[in-house]
Amino acid sequence: MVCYPTFGGSGVVATELGMALARAGHEVHFITYSQPVRLALLEKNIYYHEVDVPEYPLFKHQPYDLALSSKLVDTIKGYKIEVLHVHYAIPHAYAGYMAKMMLKEEGIIIPMITTLHGTDITLVGSHPFYKTAVTFSINKSDIVTAVSENLKDTTFEMFEVDREIEVVPNFIDAAKYAEMQNQPCDRNLMALKEEFIITHVSNFRPVKRIKDVILVFKQILDKHPAVLVMVGEGPDRIKAERLSKELGIYSKVKFLGNSVEIDRVLCMSDLFLLPSDQESFGLAALEAMINKTPVISSNAGGLPEVNIHGLSGYVAEIGDVEKMGQYALDILKDSETLNRFKENARKAALEFDLPKILPLYVSIYEKAYKARKQNSEL
């Protein structure tokens, strides 16, 4: 399992997938430059291999893809790994292909599954400097998956892909959240009894439209007592703090920074705001929904596939903060409506429960391994 070890969606999904596979009895090896943030190393069947990138003054930028491909070769040979699953096209699929070619020289055939997560296609991959390499890496993968129908369509539109892309959506482990819901949510830690708790979780990059989050919250605050809980760090945090001060609502906005206790925040939330310019899937929305938190989102990317309009929340055009504010007020207008949306949000999230999605990946691994055996016998 090759992934980024950070708080980003692709790394979280890869880590959760690997741990679920390990619990199901499969041996899983994580190969990345630092330990993934959600990886539990003490669980059975889980191994972590750090990619060390030596510092050489000759290089202006250290060649991580070269170090990764070499580490892949050594690990695959040393542990007799049978399937390689890379998350995020650049540089992981590219390094994976180079490792495949080096192994092939030694008579070792290993299939590579590449999962596309979003910004590897829409932002990084579309850059002219990377587009050729991304196209090559996708086409040289044995199996390609995307986390939403929208991302699949976007990939075909932006790249000259000559192979099938299977859609395997991101997932949530409902059992884990069921255990948490038996524990009390201390709303008094965040808000007064009469205040609604509105939440946003992201990396605070421009694509997340943090300004829109503040503007939608201002509309809510004009009608109801409320607080806004902002979880995450990124370049637009300072702008968000400045805007909330200009609007006179800074005392009602709580900036928590990066947190490993996101679920504790979501379990006490009444509404989740996600007005992004682009979301290939919307994992943050799904995590809110499983915690019975309805979502107000834009219609960007794969969000409408996750946040069902009128059921788990509402979907509006990108940038239409007035409509988002109206939708938010509609959900918060009375306790009966709010509770209905809360229950429906969880029901919608259960469509992405881990027991439904994990067999899809296992089936893909089996298909790739079977094809590899056939190819090695030719």
Name the predicted role of every residue range.
Residues 294-297, 307:
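Short hydrophobic beta-strand element within catalytic cores of glycosyltransferases
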Residues 178-192:
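A short helix/loop element that forms part of the nucleotide-sugar donor recognition site in Leloir-type
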Residues 258, 277:
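Aromatic "clamp/platform" in nucleotide-sugar-dependent glycosyltransferases that forms part
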Residues 145, 191-217, 229:
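Conserved donor-binding/catalytic core segment of Leloir-type glycosyltransferases
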Residues 309-310, 314-321, 330-335, 350:
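Conserved acidic donor-binding segment of nucleotide-sugar-dependent glycosyltransferases
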